[in-house]
Structures are given as structure tokens and as C-alpha cells.
């Protein structure tokens, strides 16, 4: 069973390989927080995910298929993605979320949307993270013990792994050179442009 939606975000750093690395085929976990799903791929297999162009979104499919979150439509209950478990990647290669603990370095990405008011239920546990206002993207820290990964909002004294709060407003034209440059992917404006492009909301500039 898929833990995450691979065609939206594979949870690994930028690259055409499964984990953005070249070389022989290798086996790795599919970004699963439990590390219980494995997949093997060859280096010439292109993973067509948003992660490969610096932005991605993943959602806990396993929890969804387990009916952890449902909605009623027409008298029938349908499983839905739990908004408390959506995760966003921007500039995944250049924002390396490695955290060294007990001489072990992990490469998992753990950026979460944090909402001041949002909370959700996931597999019987309550979480205070939700895919709410992207302006409240907080800096997280990730701790890994065996196959278990815990992610919580970091404080100034923690070993920080992700972005601090994104700027409150990112206008499409605020930083065109950097946003459109393929040499500066750790760039919130570029990620915003890409997302706006997917949504068809970037204005077309006409040079008269």
C-alpha cells in the first residue's frame, strides 16, 4: 500500500532518480514515516514528481484508506485526505532537511503546514498541524528512533531542519529573476510561481 502519493511528491530531494541521486539502482522507503514501504528503482527511471522541480505535496494515503477521515455525500461516507497530514516541499534539493542524531544523518523532508486554529485526527491520535494558511509554515524538527519518526514544531533552541515562516505575501512578480532561475531553487518566490502556474493564476505579461 502506498503511504504517500508519489506522483505529487516523493518526499526526497531534487533529482531525476528516486532520491535525486545517480548511480546503480537502490532500495529506499517511499517517504513513509514508519519506514515500512520499500521500492527499488534504477537510476535511469525518471520519477515524474513535483519534487523533482523543487515543489511537492504529499498526503497520508494509508491513513485515508483506513477511513481515518470521512465526509458524507448523498448519504454515503467517503474517505478523504486528512488535511492535518498534508506536507509541502519547496526547493527540496537545496533545503536539505538532514538532521544528525546519535551520529546518524536522516534525509527525510518534514515540512508541515501549521495552522493557528487547525487540528485533526489521524489514526486515533490528535495532531495540531493542518494544511491551512501557507503563511504559517513553521520550522520543524525531526527525531528518528529506529523506524519511527516524530516531527514537531521547533523552537529557537532546537536543532532546526526546515524553513522559518514564509513571507506573508509572495507576489508573482516580486522576484522574477530568482524565481525563474534554475540556479536558485531554494527560493520561495519560485515555488510560489510554480504553484500559481499549476493553478493557472500567473498573469500573462504582454510586452507592448
Swiss-Prot record:
<feature type="compositionally biased region" description="Low complexity">
    <location>
        <begin position="100"/>
        <end position="132"/>
    </location>
</feature>
<feature type="region of interest" description="Disordered">
    <location>
        <begin position="97"/>
        <end position="172"/>
    </location>
</feature>
<protein>
    <recommendedName>
        <fullName>Putative adhesin P1-like protein MPN_468</fullName>
    </recommendedName>
</protein>
<comment type="similarity">
    <text>Belongs to the adhesin P1 family.</text>
</comment>
<feature type="region of interest" description="Disordered">
    <location>
        <begin position="29"/>
        <end position="49"/>
    </location>
</feature>
<feature type="compositionally biased region" description="Low complexity">
    <location>
        <begin position="159"/>
        <end position="172"/>
    </location>
</feature>
<feature type="compositionally biased region" description="Polar residues">
    <location>
        <begin position="145"/>
        <end position="158"/>
    </location>
</feature>
Amino acid at each position: 500500500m502506498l503511504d504517500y502519493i508519489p506522483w505529487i511528491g516523493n518526499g526526497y530531494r531534487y533529482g531525476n532518480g528516486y532520491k535525486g541521486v545517480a548511480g546503480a539502482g537502490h532500495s529506499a522507503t517511499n517517504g513513509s514515516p514508519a519506514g515500512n514501504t520499500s521500492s527499488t528503482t534504477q537510476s535511469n527511471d525518471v520519477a515524474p514528481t513535483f519534487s523533482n522541480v523543487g515543489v511537492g505535496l504529499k498526503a497520508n494515503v494509508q491513513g485515508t484508506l483506513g477511513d481515518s477521515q470521512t465526509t458524507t455525500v448523498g448519504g454515503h461516507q467517503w474517505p478523504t485526505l486528512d488535511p492535518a497530514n498534508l506536507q509541502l516541499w519547496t526547493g527540496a534539493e537545496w533545503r536539505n532537511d538532514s538532521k544528525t542524531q546519535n551520529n546518524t544523518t536522516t534525509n527525510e523532508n518534514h515540512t508541515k503546514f501549521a495552522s493557528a486554529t487547525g487540528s485533526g485526527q489521524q489514526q486515533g491520535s490528535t495532531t495540531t498541524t493542518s494544511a491551512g494558511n501557507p503563511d504559517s509554515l513553521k520550522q520543524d524538527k525531526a527525531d528518528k528512533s529506529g523506524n519511527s519518526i516524530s516531527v514537531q514544531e521547533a523552537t529557537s533552541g532546537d536543532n532546526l531542519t526546515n524553513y522559518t515562516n514564509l513571507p506573508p505575501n509572495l507576489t508573482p512578480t516580486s522576484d522574477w529573476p530568482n524565481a525563474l532561475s534554475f540556479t536558485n531553487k531554494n527560493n520561495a518566490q519560485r515555488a510560489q510561481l510554480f504553484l500559481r502556474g499549476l493553478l493557472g493564476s500567473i498573469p500573462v505579461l504582454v510586452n507592448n
